[in-house]
């Protein structure tokens, strides 16, 4: 750390019963009261360098003729130590200045008026010497600039008026972003800050700190985390806006350190915690992956609990949505603080999914709008070519991008967790499930498990809601194990069970005879399936239009029941499907 020594005389100040005096052959003719300390001094050395004291003494001489004049400095900035250093400078006593006390002495010298206007002779007054020390020593050192900035919080208004705060922030920002080989050598990628500056010793004595010696082995992000919110925010803004670009990842790491230090420790005051959180969010870099998705989701959880502004929440959701493929299910369980009764914020997760889809490929969107009516996905897409494909393949010609498949699996796992919420509505569940495009789900096993969990927790939902919930399930994309479980699930609508059994039986039948099926025969079967689907769909829509409103709905036969006249009992249902299988084999 750099320091400056002024003066050459030994220290002759002493204390007698809380009164500070100077050892001298001359009688004391000036009494100065600073805070609770009284100083017995002499007019000549003090008035020759302090314009304020000179004016105060001059105004009192016209009113009183006492030999000892008493001056009370009631609004003196800082503590008595700063005043005493200024007084010793007036007497020529050696004083040592460094980053720890230069701000207090600079403010005291400004208050006392120790400028060139009152200085007698050719030597500079204290204000000029302090400014020279700040410019040539303190602001050339990252560590000294940081320590000096820390001390400005004791005298914030004076430091602002004198420009010390802004100059410290500017010096710190330059020290962080400067390139190697100049006054600072900042090893940014390893997180170490080393100072190799060599300061010229001009008219004042600057000592301390070797040129090649490492000034600090601590990362600058850890040091800045010790600052108060206002100084930290201003410093980070200066670093981000510097003409020398710094890695966004380092900015993000610094913000993570600051958030981990301050957010958990200010639970007493929600206003303070909100202010810290809002500031951290506003300082987040725009670049993707500059901060981990886990950190963004952690901030989003805090934002929901602390009720920060809606714009801040949306900013976090957008940033997290851009890298949703790196999230985990537990990180997506964002608590909901409103009075809806739901445990988790499903809407913000839905927004993140949509943001991810638009970010990774703007052309990708859910295949169905909210107001669009449709039957289940299995009913919409049944055709023989797809049934003949091996299990696990997609219904499209090409597999979806790996990131889309990963997010689809993440959403399905998330649905399994939130399905346990007794207050979760079917609409919320379905809307989130439908944000994933149909082609992005390679397998519907996880989606079925989520539906099963929801039905087990919400056994009293109406039949129309149960039917709506199961429409998002594509039976063709269920594995053998999932199909077996679903066929025996009494909570599923009977129509869904019929679809599952039909698809399984059709797949098994076609698997044994696919080598013998001609193109014409396949076309005939395909037209047969299409005709039956249209007839069953028309009959189902007519029944939906005549269904009673309110209470539990009467059971409506599914289109497959209408097609095949399948009884409601599972055993008879299975027998009927077996007969369908035999008839198909005979036709083939």
Swiss-Prot record:
Start and end residues of each stretch annotated as Disordered: 529-554
Protein's pathway: Protein modification; protein ubiquitination
Domain NPH3: 218-507
Domain BTB: start-end pairs: 28-99
GO biological process terms held by the UniProt record: protein ubiquitination
Modification Phosphotyrosine occurs at: 448
Entry keywords, A to Z: Phosphoprotein, Ubl conjugation pathway
One Pfam entry name: BTB
Gene3D superfamilies listed in its UniProt record: Potassium Channel Kv1.1, Chain A
Keyword Phosphoprotein: yes
InterPro entries the UniProt entry points to: BTB/POZ_dom, NPH3/RPT2-like, NPH3_dom, SKP1/BTB/POZ_sf
Entry's Gene Ontology cellular component terms: plasma membrane
Positions bearing Phosphoserine: 376, 378
Entry text on domains: The BTB/POZ domain mediates the interaction with some component of ubiquitin ligase complexes.
Family the UniProt entry places it in: Belongs to the NPH3 family.
Function: May act as a substrate-specific adapter of an E3 ubiquitin-protein ligase complex (CUL3-RBX1-BTB) which mediates the ubiquitination and subsequent proteasomal degradation of target proteins.
Name by which UniProt lists this protein: BTB/POZ domain-containing protein At3g26490
